[in-house]
Swiss-Prot record:
Family to which this protein belongs: Belongs to the TFE family.
Gene Ontology biological process terms from the UniProt entry: regulation of DNA-templated transcription; transcription initiation at RNA polymerase II promoter
InterPro entries: TF_E_archaea, TFE, TFIIE/TFIIEa_HTH, TFIIE_asu, TFIIEa/SarR/Rpc3_HTH_dom, WH-like_DNA-bd_sf, WH_DNA-bd_sf, Znf_TFIIB
Entries under SUPFAM superfamilies matching the protein: Winged helix' DNA-binding domain
Domain remarks: The winged helix domain is involved in binding to DNA in the preinitiation complex.
Function statement: Transcription factor that plays a role in the activation of archaeal genes transcribed by RNA polymerase. Facilitates transcription initiation by enhancing TATA-box recognition by TATA-box-binding protein (Tbp), and transcription factor B (Tfb) and RNA polymerase recruitment. Not absolutely required for transcription in vitro, but particularly important in cases where Tbp or Tfb function is not optimal. It dynamically alters the nucleic acid-binding properties of RNA polymerases by stabilizing the initiation complex and destabilizing elongation complexes.
Superkingdom in the source lineage: Archaea
Keywords: DNA-binding, Transcription, Transcription regulation
GO molecular-function terms, A-Z: DNA binding
Gene designation: tfe
Protein name: Transcription factor E
All residue ranges annotated as the HTH TFE/IIEalpha-type domain in the record: 10-130
Natural source organism: Methanocorpusculum labreanum (strain ATCC 43576 / DSM 4855 / Z)
Pfam family, one: TFIIE_alpha
TM region(s), chain numbering: none
Amino acid sequence: MTVITEEQLGNPAIYQYLLKLVGEEGLELLRRWSDVSYARRWVEEKLSSEDLKAADKARFLAESRRSDEDLVEAERSDEEIAELTGINLNSVRHTLYNLYEHRLAEYRRIKNNETGWLTYLWLMRMDHMNMVLRNEMEVAAGKLAGRLRYDEANDFYQCKNCGITTTFNNAMTTNFSCPQCGTMLVHFDDELIITALKKRLAKMQTALDNA
């Protein structure tokens, strides 16, 4: 399915990733957009409207006959998503753009030949979630590996007074004096940091191998 599932929301890694990406309101938007009861209620309200045009009535009659899965996975404009979910339009747009930037939503543009107006029809792509998480983890693992190489390739010196840590080469340029306070720099043993980095990188690599 392209919409979000309860199984995905119950996955701690997916939940935390989405929470960081779109926030609590964005998560609520995803829940409601994926909940067929919201879609059914919205369609019923549209059909009961006395101001509904004939063309729109035909469209919503067709919508009412859709299966639950087809109804929640249908393309919607941002205005329709706001109506359907009851969430502020600006918040809907902000969430959609964030999802789009991370390949978790996509849109299709249609043009009104009479007015020239463009309408963007949006579709959730939560079926991309595993791929997105894997890519994010690969990027994070790459950065971590780079940090590990840097730490292993350098000796470090630290100022006990203000906490500045610098490399051996940089410390030589200041005659092993702190560039801020002048205190003599002392050798900093980063073996514990290197060990922690190796363990974290190994865990990430195991997770990637099993993804």
